[in-house]
């Protein structure tokens, strides 16, 4: 192509480029909400896959948390939910682990709930977010016999690139031992959420798989109008027992577009990452 032909072709090239830009930005111009990416992980008190947080140093706990920071930077979820995460505990350094993760992975917002608070221990569930959070609440479940109390945190965030649509986001941890205790805890979660009108995302270590005698997730589905990604699929998030204990549940006005279990060894659980689409409301 000589210079004259190049000059003649240039306007056509520019028109094509302009059309491509217009096509790529159609969703934004039309005000269609962006995908919302979320992650959930049981941090296991920053012990990674070690036997106990009692047998490691504060430096080792920080190194394990840095691994989570690296994954957050790689995956870039808008919001991450954590369970078994410490705020001020003697066994892993007496510092706020959610704050540590948020600051180092560039998440400007974080909120932690201490469901255990006493005997030099303070830990529970947490959320970190790149979206502003409001109306943050921490709820403790009733303490079962001879084991730690569980609970959840809930916060409201604005769905990115939406027309002022708020979404309620939950990080929850249910009892590990008894089904009846988990059902009692689920009913308390339902009581808190059922009167809230926002779309909802529930994430966490539910300590339950799906089907058979496990009625926990079906109870949440029927009571809160939530669903999950391929509930009967053979997905493993807790390798030790080869079970799916960690879940992302969304209300019926949200679609799970993608769902992945990360292979990184960050704790005895595997992190779950999902991309969500807000349907028309």
Label each PLM-derived region with a short phrase:
Residues 14-20:
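Sec-dependent signal peptide recognition
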Residues 28-104, 117, 187, 279-281:
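N-terminal, active-site-proximal structural segment of metallo-dependent hydrolase catalytic domains
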Residues 35, 85-166, 260-263:
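Structured beta-strand-rich core segments of catalytic domains in phosphoester-bond hydrolases
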Residues 40, 79-81, 111-112, 168-171, ...:
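Structural recognition of the beta-strand scaffold that forms the well-ordered cores
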Residues 41-43, 85, 172-174, 205-206:
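Active-site metal-binding loops of divalent metal-dependent hydrolases
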Residues 156-159, 180, 184-187, 191-201, ...:
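Metal-dependent phosphoester-hydrolase catalytic domains
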